[in-house]
A protein has these predicted regions:
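A general structural signal for well-ordered alpha-helical segments in protein cores
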Residues: 49, 81, 85, 110, ...
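Catalytic alpha/beta core domains of metabolic enzymes, predominantly
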Residues: 149, 161-268
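Secondary-structure boundary/capping signal
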Residues: 96-97, 155, 184, 206, ...
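Alpha-helical structural signal in soluble globular domains
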Residues: 83, 87-91, 116, 120, ...
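Active-site beta->alpha loop and helix N-cap motifs at the rims of alpha/beta catalytic domains
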Residues: 11-165
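C-terminal alpha-helical cap/extension of soluble enzyme domains
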Residues: 10-21, 25-36, 55, 59-61, ...
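N-terminal amphipathic/basic-hydrophobic helices that include classical n-h-c signal peptides
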Residues: 1-12
Length: 320
């Protein structure tokens, strides 16, 4: 494979590019990137990450989000975080917005991580609530308010009660949306009617990105989708959401969704990281294994995944 050529940009040019991006609203399909590791899992595979970014942009995704749950952010050191952000920001070079996952339990750490992300060139940050202390609404208002006061880039609030142990209901988000920088929410429950309720309660203060139900959310007012499946199938994922949310073409979007649907069980649920990395291996794009305690996808599931990828045309058919 040819080496990836990354355009060289001066600090002034990169800063100007970032300012231009921030003035535009985030919308469309944003891939929450996996983190490639070396074969022994001991280091982040930065060249593989750069190839992944190029693969995503070449296939039309609208934005990139490293260091989310799919990126195994809780298994990443502080130095590795900095290297990941540097790689994604510099490789994308202003072609698509880059949001960085900066969630942590301690508000002070979230502030520090968010400031670092902004200093490294991020266009925004995605922040899950503190996930052990089960904060109240006043505590959440204080938490997000402190971060918003510390940075000048937009915040995407991340609601995932299955992992955060706190559920940001539409009524709570209506209050959080009054914090000026909290302009987006990633809504990751399986209650798709919440998209409708957030749109109604928040108005233009906060826009909705689907976190799970991309197809369904598009019809209820979501302007974006933070997708795991777009790691593996970026063009199909992007086209499906765009055709539903912005073209309002039911027949075309449903046809695309039906093509994508067989992949979703393998990149969702408890094995979403191992399934995504196994898919890349089958596609000839090695991304390493998940870090423990996650384990690789079992062989029987890998065989089933291979059949799905063949059916989608993402890997070649077996020789007759």
């Amino acid at each position: 494979m040819d080496a990836i050529r990354v355009p060289i940009m001066t600090d002034a040019t990169l800063a100007a590019s970032r300012r231009a991006k921030v003035t535009k609203p985030f919308r469309g399909t944003y891939t929450v990137l996996i983190t490639p590791f070396t074969p022994d899992g001991g280091a982040v595979d930065i060249p593989a990450l750069a190839r992944l970014v190029e693969f995503q942009i070449a296939n039309g995704v609208d934005g990139l989000i490293p260091l989310g749950s799919t990126g195994e952010f809780l298994s990443i050191s502080r130095d590795e975080r900095a290297a990941i952000v540097d790689c994604v920001v510099k490789t994308s070079a202003g072609r698509v917005p880059v949001l960085i996952g900066t969630g942590a339990e301690d508000t002070r750490e979230v502030v520090a991580l968010s400031r670092e992300a902004e200093a490294q060139g991020a266009d925004g940050v995605m922040i899950i609530p503190p996930f052990y202390s089960v904060p109240t609404l006043p505590e959440l208002m204080h938490h997000y308010g402190r971060v918003a006061d510390a940075i000048g880039i937009p915040i995407m609030v991340y609601n995932n009660p299955a992992t955060a142990n706190v559920d940001l209901t539409p009524a709570m988000l209506a209050e959080i949306s009054r914090i000026p920088n909290c302009r987006y929410v990633k809504e990751s429950t399986l209650e798709v009617t919440r998209v409708r309720d957030i749109v109604a309660l928040c108005g233009d203060r906060m826009e909705v990105f689907a976190g799970v139900l991309g197809y369904e959310s598009a019809w209820l007012g979501a302007i974006g989708w933070v997708a795991v499946c777009s790691n593996v199938a970026p063009r199909l994922s992007r086209d499906m959401f765009w055709t539903a949310a912005f073209d309002a073409d039911r027949a075309a979007s449903l046809a695309l969704y039906r093509r994508l649907a067989p992949l979703l069980p393998f990149v969702g649920g408890p094995r979403y990281v191992s399934g995504t990395k196994a898919a890349f291996r089958l596609m000839g794009m090695e991304m390493g294994e998940p870090r423990p305690p996650r384990l690789p996808l079992p062989p029987e599931d890998t065989a089933a995944l291979a059949a799905v990828l063949r059916g989608m045309g993402l890997i070649a058919d077996r020789p007759a």
